[in-house]
Structures are given as structure tokens and as C-alpha cells.
């Protein structure tokens, strides 16, 4: 039984938010497992913690320079004793450039507990449709 699935998910999402807002790709990649899968907002698949960290540093240095994000956990539930499925929403604020503006997205995360604690094994980011 996972104790506090919401607490685990909130902590990991909070680390992502802090790393994004500090424009720190290395710190953004840290909560991910070494073999994590990340599907970005454009549907591109990134494999592994190093690729996730490097890819985020690249966007922090270019199209998302000086941007900020706010994540909010929507739900988290235990699938197995060492597996949590979580959903969050995020609001990205980009001050300038070709992607300037506010963008809302929903994230699905698979969290795994291993020898080094809880890590993000899967992350899928999807734009929220505007109505």
C-alpha cells in the first residue's frame, strides 16, 4: 500500500515546478528515472533522464527563456504497491518570443518506487483544448 500517493506526487511535481522556474534543466531531469519516457507538448518522445534534462535546458535557454510554470495535482492513486498514476494541470507563462502568452496543459505521470525512492517513469504533456 502506498502511503500518501497525493503527497508523493505533489512533492515530485513541486520539484519540476521549482526547476522550471529556476530554468535548471539538470534539476528538472533529476526526479525522472534513468530510463524515463517523456512525451512533450508537441508529441515528441524523449527517452532517459539525461535527454529530458538536456532537452529542457535547451528550451529554458531559447523559446521558454524567462518563462514560469505552475503545476497543480488533480489526482493520484496507487496502481500497485510501488506504482502511482497521477494527473496534474499546468499553466505556462511565456513573456516573449514566438510562443509568448499563457498555455494550459494536463500531465499524466507514472511514478515508481525503487531503491533510490520515488521517480517519474512516464510523463505525458497535453495542451488543454480551448473552447
Describe the role of every protein-language-model region.
Residues 81-92:
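A short hydrophobic beta-strand element
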